[in-house]
Amino acid sequence: MLRAGMILTVQKMSFDFSKRVAVAARLLAVAGLAAVAGACGPAPPAPRAGPLRVLATTTIVADLARQIGGDRVAVECLMAAGIDPHSYKPTPRDADRLATADVVVANGLHLEGRLAELLERLGRRRPVVAVGEALPQDDLLSAGGDRHDPHVWFDPRLWARCGTELADALARIDPPGAEGYAARGRDYAARLTTLDAAVRDRLAGIPEERRVLVTAHAAFRYFGRAYGVEVVGVQGTSTESEAGLADINRLVELVVTRRIPAVFIETSVSDRSVAALREGAAARGHEVSLGGTLLSDSLGGPGSGAETLEAALRANAATIAAALGSSTP
């Protein structure tokens, strides 16, 4: 639960930034974000005539902020569509934008690893809401060690709970808008429940032996858990390191042995590893088709038809169902 006067802030344990302190410190100096000694937590911004200025880290989080905030917020997004948040490097301009926002909304759970220092320091000065951090650990998948898989938006039921947490946080920052935030949170949760059922129906016709989703990185594990699909990524849950030859060979063996018909690339991740996987399978006599492009760590850009999470998940489900031979239209 959020304490009175305290907004859900990015937890130190959720960011591994020790190797990037020098870069982050320079950015913090540019933005004037040095921590204040003895700071006891962020204070809500003073009442203002216009909407709250919300800066979201990713397109997916920005969509959530718009859905919950409605006309009481003006949302900007730090990362453009198609950007990989795992490897995104903050710039001095990012520090300026973070410093002038009324509220910063992040995913957390290590997704924005290279923004760690900025977000943690900023959280001592103003509200930083990390929606993924509010989920019970029992609902999170492990990413190795003490880390959790950050791609929680791929389970609509979990994302609905993130929406509720954001509504609660915004209500504490902007009490006059509390009723509206709560109402929009309930409406969004209902729509995500409908979406969950639609995705489930769309995937139901995929034969059991073909319910294997092979992608560039392991972003779809929550999706797999929710819909009974085995998920295999050439890379792990983060894209900060390239897939090695051993990773490629392991996946080639799996694809060939199980006669997997299709693999998928992602909009925000290089397709090099998937291309190498297909070449390796072909060398073993098994042709693997390219099933299509999935939206993973970013929504589609303007005019793509996938500018919201709801649209993106529907598009992904249609692409997966078609490539894996679903009998459901």
Could you tell me what each predicted segment is?
Residues 1-21:
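Short, intrinsically disordered or compositionally biased N-terminal tails of bacterial proteins
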Residues 15-16, 23, 30, 270:
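Short amphipathic alpha-helical "recognition" segments used for binding
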